[in-house]
Amino acid sequence: TADAIGADYCHDECPGVAGTPDAVAEVTSTEQAAAVVKLCAEAGVPVTVRGAGTGQAGGSVPVSGGVVLSLKAMDQILEFDEAACTLRVQPGILLQEVKAEAEKRGLYYPPDPGEKTATIGGNAATNASGPNAVKYGTTRDYVASLTVVRADGSTETLSGADLESVIGSEGTLAVITELTLKLIGKPKADAILLFPFMDTETCLNAANALLAKDYAPAVVEYMDTDIVEFSGNVTGNPVFPVEMDGERVGATLMLTLEGEDDDSVMEKMEEIAELAEEIECLDILVGDTPTMKREFWAAHDAFHTSMESGAKNAIEYNITVPAEKIAEMVEYAKAEGEAKGLKVMAYAHVGSGGMHIHAVSDGEKAEFAAKVIELAALIYGKCSELGGSIRGEYGIGCAKKQHLGAEALDKFSALKAKYDPKGILNPGKAAD
């Protein structure tokens, strides 16, 4: 209860969002979770579900007080079904542990959001995805079934179309207590290609041109040179090109190709190399050894953490826009950020349209906080104008809910009335 509650239960990774629960209930089974929710429903007490607390949108923060239902101890692998190629797990197991278990069995769990220490339940609650969504899709595509606790404390097993009422609902419609995940065969061979370009527009035009062809890349990643340079300086391990032949690179495209064997991957690489002049890239750099591939991904995965450690103030805006609108969104965010005295940098998963826009400053915290609130309204407004979604990969939480449109609010209200009429599950989040 209150006096013994640690600070970790009062926040996630979203800056400026905090809340103090009245109690924390750590559970290890569906039955225990159901009992807690039933008691809270009868008493009208809010329930905020929490996994690892790695969210970026305030989704697991108890902004309305009440009870934090911690699922972190529900971290067991329950069953591997070899015939169905599925893995049944509890929600508190970490993404990296699910991936390792699949790897151990010679299989592959594709969803690959940046935070590997997030829980698998949190991934399902936000429908997390990552760079390889262009080929493999999102978490939703790899959930065969769920066991959930509804807002009245009843339990239910869901599959097929019924999963839509829970996956991506951010703990506002049900508590996920068990997941059966689909595993697939591992890619047998792969390689990474880097394409530096003089500017963002040329880079993204090339990305869309390559996507239109029959190469089926697993990753098509846009990286602007500002973020490449900033991150490389912070980590002391610059990997991606910043200059070529004395000229500053504008942006780099990272492409991952997969195939049945090395020869099939090489064939794709050779076909793409023939397009170098057409797509106006400055060069093509190849990563086809385990060491090079690890270095490329380590440099890419350092973007987020380097913002936090390399600047006095940092914030991220995570959105999704149509692939053909990414260049316009990048230029808009940079211009608006610059007008406010902020340095704005970006990278994006081109195939799925997922964007990570970072703003940093070494100014005063209060001034930065005011500026990034203004910038958020501009970025989210532009995102909607371009036909995108502010949900992105991190969800809405409480950080973005004020920017949702009337249509999204109405749709959510109808679901909330159906599944949680008392409004006890994760109040103040998503469209609540």
Residue map of PLM features:
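Conserved, mostly hydrophobic/aromatic
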Residues: 40, 171, 357, 420
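C-terminal substrate-recognition/cap domain of FAD-linked oxidoreductases
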Residues: 4-11, 181, 185, 194-375, ...
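Activity-critical C-terminal alpha-helical subdomain
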Residues: 400-432
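Glycine-rich N-terminal segment of FAD-binding domains in flavoprotein oxidoreductases
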Residues: 5, 11-74, 349, 383
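Alpha-helix capping/hinge segments and adjacent helical runs
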Residues: 384-396, 421-425
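FAD-binding subdomain of flavoenzyme oxidoreductases
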Residues: 76-83, 87-221, 425-426
